[in-house]
Amino acid sequence: MTNSLLFDPNTYDPEHIDPETRRLLRALIEWFESRGKKRLIEDDLEAVWPEDFLEFVKREKLFATFPTPAESAGGDPGKRWDAARNAALSEIFGFYGLAYWYAWQVTVLGLGPIWMSGNRAAKDRAARLLDDGGVLAFGLSEREHGADVYSTDTLLPPPPGVVGVCS
């Protein structure tokens, strides 16, 4: 049971969340804890690309499970946009390091315009990329009226030969 207002990986147990989400959150904590504080700090200070973290995300389908709306989940009840689950995941990422939180947050921000659009093909593609372990991002700049993600439908294809990641 979690009784503290502060995150403690030793006692964290979000009892208000479904069992599969709890399993994923515990698996994430165990992944971080298995690295140890020393390695996490060294990786942060050396700005190490979190490739092993992204492999874990891909294997556990974290970014496919947490930020995918039910309508794009292909009938999988575990995949849903749920603010309580997403907040719990964000708290864990924030506790262990900015690089991990940043990969999550950039993905969430990149998904916003896609999920809000009426573009079914883009939604299906985003869901498929997330299921394949992709990390997404979105950037938009307009001279006329600023970055207006609500009224702009934009498709940014990856460079030739790049699968699942746009740079």
Where is each model-derived feature located?
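Active-site-proximal "nucleotidyltransferase
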Residues: G139
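A short secondary-structure junction signal
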Residues: V149-S151
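Amphipathic, small/basic residue-rich leader segments at the start of a protein or domain
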Residues: M1-Q105, G112, M116-L136, E144-A147, ...
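Hydrophobic/aromatic beta-strand elements that line small-molecule binding cavities or substrate pockets
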Residues: D153-L156
